[in-house]
Amino acid sequence: MKEEQLSLFKQALSRLEVTKQDREFLYTVSMTLSGHPEVFRKCYLAFMNGEDSYHYHPMIGAPLDFFFEGSEVRVKRLKEEVVLSRGHFIQYASYVDLCFSRIYPLGSVVELDRDLLPQDLVAAFESEQMDFFVVLSGRRVVMETGSYIDYIGYTWPFGLRFDTAPLFVSNLFIKRVVSEGYTDMTDERYCQEAFRREYFNEGIVSSVYGEEIVNED
């Protein structure tokens, strides 16, 4: 994790209308979520799916417990806890995602989680006897709604074809990375400045959270 990401996240937290003490607690929680992206993914999926709670109890380190209680979300770590409105929790999650989620290089091949995909898409993959592999060709693409989709991609190994529409891929749908594309310092700097800082300054978040925030309003 880079200092620029931590600095940006602190700025993001300052936009959250909670007490200073709650903000410090949420910062501590975010260090676990950013260091364990699968925990963050499973937690937010549990929230989206209407589950009652999500628990992360590692062998080493402090446990985290999330309780989804109607219009509120209770976050507990050891003996400390904070209660957020649903809207504030969604806003918090969008900042964790914006600042800390890995942005995979162009050309990366990822496997999608079939259990999270629409049935018609699953059927399309299975009819061609294909693995659920997608090659990523676009990142954090801003849509007409003003939010961004994490990736645009095409089925692997076919790639771009004139008779095939691109796939919109959320971070939540990615089960694993099969092969990473090329990256260097220029690419990393671009991701930090364009996809993180500029989006933060413009108030652009992932469509996963943008739609939720609209629904909350």
Where are these regions (language model features)?
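N-terminal intrinsically disordered, low-complexity, charge/repeat-rich segments that act as generic
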Residues: 1-69
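Basic/aromatic-rich interaction segments and small domains that mediate binding to polyanionic partners
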Residues: 48, 56-73, 124-181
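Charge-rich, low-complexity terminal tails
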Residues: 67-76, 80-83, 217
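Mixed-charge, Lys/Arg-rich low-complexity intrinsically disordered regions
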Residues: 77-118
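Intrinsically disordered, low-complexity, charged/polar segments
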Residues: 86-96, 148-217
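Amphipathic, soluble alpha/beta structural segments
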Residues: 111-115, 135-138, 203-212
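Short boundary/loop segments of OB/S1/cold-shock single-stranded nucleic-acid-binding domains
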Residues: 118-124
